[in-house]
Structure formats: structure tokens, C-alpha cells
Amino acid sequence: MEKFDIAMTVFLVMIFLFIFLPIIYMLSNPGDLNQLLDKEVIEAFKTTLLAGAVATLIALIFGIPTGYILARYDFKFKSFVEAVLDLPMAIPHSVIGIIILSFIYGIDIINFIGRYVVDNFWGIVTVYLFVGIPFMVNSIRDGFLSVDEEIEYVSRTLGASKIRTFFEISLPLIKNNIISGIILSFARGISEVGAILIIAYYPKTVPILIYERFMSFGLDASKPISVGMILISIALFALLRMFGRMRGR
């Protein structure tokens, strides 16, 4: 190898180890895993995974038509719309909580929604949806962009309606993008802490419980639950990589 290649490889190894070593150390020193059988921990996992599933389903329902429109149509202010849809990825997490709370209580006609959002399961779903929708929309939009419009055109010239072409031709061709969007949106949602602290501390999600255990009892008390979340994250991104390879074939 040339010196340049060696230098580049050193940077790769350093950044890889920067991420890999702490994770491996954590997994090899998980603390008392019996904590994962604690009723409060089990309930937190149930709440987190269920809220993540509901938010991801809603994101999917809205993400498919949104991604299709962004991929297939040009319209005024399209760039602005795309920028707004991407904003949740750039806004600090705690600020997202303030934004949602301010909107709910700042507009009189929707004040009543507060009782269903603040310290409520649906508040968790709302936050998860807010932070996860950009990943769903972007993945699906990229999928539609990768489908040759000529295929859809041929389908319609052969007598298929636009809606039939959409469901029988376009959607099946982007199934891996849809799955990737689901995984990314779900993973982003269940990892949220800052906005949840402000909107819905209760019922407790896993990240909130980890934060609470750490603040109350220290590092050792938070490690086993953290390991549980790490394993879920690894499983999700293993699936993502698998479907990514399938999409590239």
C-alpha cells in the first residue's frame, strides 16, 4: 500500500474503533441483567415499542403518498416543502418538545388536545412521529425516484389505471425502500429522549427510564437497560443493512 492509502486507512480504523470499542465494552460489561425482568423495565419496553410501532404506521400511511408526490411532481415551493419535512432532523431534541407543547397550548381551538398528549401515550406517539417522518418520506421518495417512469407509462398505455399502476407496479418495486423507511423511522423514534422529557415523561419509555435510573442510582443501575436498547438497535440496523444490500442488487 502507498503512504496515502495507509494514512486513509488509519483514519478509518480510528473512527471505527471510536464507535466500536465503547459498544463492545458495554455489551461485555452489562451489569445485572436481571433488571431486565423488572416490571417497570418490561412496561417501559412495551410502551416504547408499541408507541414506535404506532408512530411508524402513521408515518408510513402519510409517507407513501408524500414521497410519491415529491418524486413525481414539480410544483411551486417544492424545495421549501422538502426543507420543512427535513427540519426535525436538524432541530435540537428538547426544542422539538417545546415546539409541540407551544403549538398545542398556544392555539385555543386545539387546547383540548393537551389532555391526550401531555404525559400520555399519544404524546409519545406524537413525538416519535415528528422526529421519524423525515426518514420515512426521504426513503420512499428515493425509492420512487429510482423507478423508471417509463414502466408506469407502459402500464397505463396497456389499460391499467393510475391507481392500479401505483399499487401493482410502483409500490412493489420500492418495497425495500419502504422497509428501510420503516426501520429508520422506528429506530429514530424509540431513541428520542429530550422531547419526551418535556411532552410525556409518563408513561415512561426506555430512554426515560435509563435517564431516571442513572440520575437516581448511578451508572450501574442504567447499564442493563441500556444494553437492551443497544441490542434492539443492532437488530434494527442489521435488518437495514440486509435490505440495503437487497436493494442494491
Swiss-Prot record:
Membrane topology of this protein: Multi-pass membrane protein
A Pfam family reported for this protein in Swiss-Prot or TrEMBL: BPD_transp_1
Domain ABC transmembrane type-1: 45-240
Keyword Membrane among UniProt keywords: yes
GO biological process: transmembrane transport
InterPro entries recorded: MetI-like (IPR000515), MetI-like_sf (IPR035906), Mo/W_ABC_Transporter_Permease (IPR053405)
Compartment list: Cell membrane
Chief place of localization: membrane
Extracellular face residues: 27-48, 115-116, 199-223
PROSITE patterns xref list: ABC_TM1
Alphabetically ordered keywords of this record: Cell membrane, Membrane, Molybdenum, Transmembrane, Transmembrane helix, Transport
Transmembrane segments: 6-26, 49-69, 94-114, 117-137, 178-198, 224-244
Phosphoprotein is among the record's keywords: no
Sequence ranges on the Cytoplasmic membrane side: 1-5, 70-93, 138-177, 245-249
UniProt GO cellular component terms: plasma membrane
Function: Part of the ABC transporter complex WtpABC involved in molybdate/tungstate import. Probably responsible for the translocation of the substrate across the membrane.
Assembly notes: The complex is composed of two ATP-binding proteins (WtpC), two transmembrane proteins (WtpB) and a solute-binding protein (WtpA).
Membership in a protein family: Belongs to the binding-protein-dependent transport system permease family.
Protein name per the record: Molybdate/tungstate transport system permease protein WtpB
Organism: Methanocaldococcus jannaschii (strain ATCC 43067 / DSM 2661 / JAL-1 / JCM 10045 / NBRC 100440)
